Amino acid sequence: MKGSSALLVALTVLCICGLTRAEDDNEFFMEFLQTLLVGTPEELYEGPLGKYNVNDMAKAALTELKSCIDELQPVHKEQLVKLLVQVLDAQEDT
């Protein structure tokens, strides 16, 4: 249940940001995921979310989401990072 809630929060944040162009969407989403996996909540606000006004409730939700990700078993988090690298490499090839 916590994982489903975390995914819902992540998708909600993406919708709230109101991204419109496909390339920008992909770039934002990949930077957002990368920061979510290996960064800090503060890096989210300074990086991919830096140009958006993130309200206190959204910040609390992102902190909770980051906490859920940080509590993943190391092997699971490692696999998510590998998947992200694979996707990033595939994007560079196109």
UniProtKB/Swiss-Prot annotation:
<feature type="signal peptide">
    <location>
        <begin position="1"/>
        <end position="22"/>
    </location>
</feature>
<dbReference type="InterPro" id="IPR035960">
    <property type="entry name" value="Secretoglobin_sf"/>
</dbReference>
<dbReference type="Pfam" id="PF01099">
    <property type="entry name" value="Uteroglobin"/>
</dbReference>
<dbReference type="InterPro" id="IPR043215">
    <property type="entry name" value="Secretoglobin_1C-like"/>
</dbReference>
<keyword id="KW-0732">Signal</keyword>
<dbReference type="InterPro" id="IPR016126">
    <property type="entry name" value="Secretoglobin"/>
</dbReference>
<keyword id="KW-0964">Secreted</keyword>
<comment type="similarity">
    <text>Belongs to the secretoglobin family.</text>
</comment>
<protein>
    <recommendedName>
        <fullName>Secretoglobin family 1C member 1</fullName>
    </recommendedName>
</protein>
<dbReference type="GO" id="GO:0005576">
    <property type="term" value="C:extracellular region"/>
</dbReference>
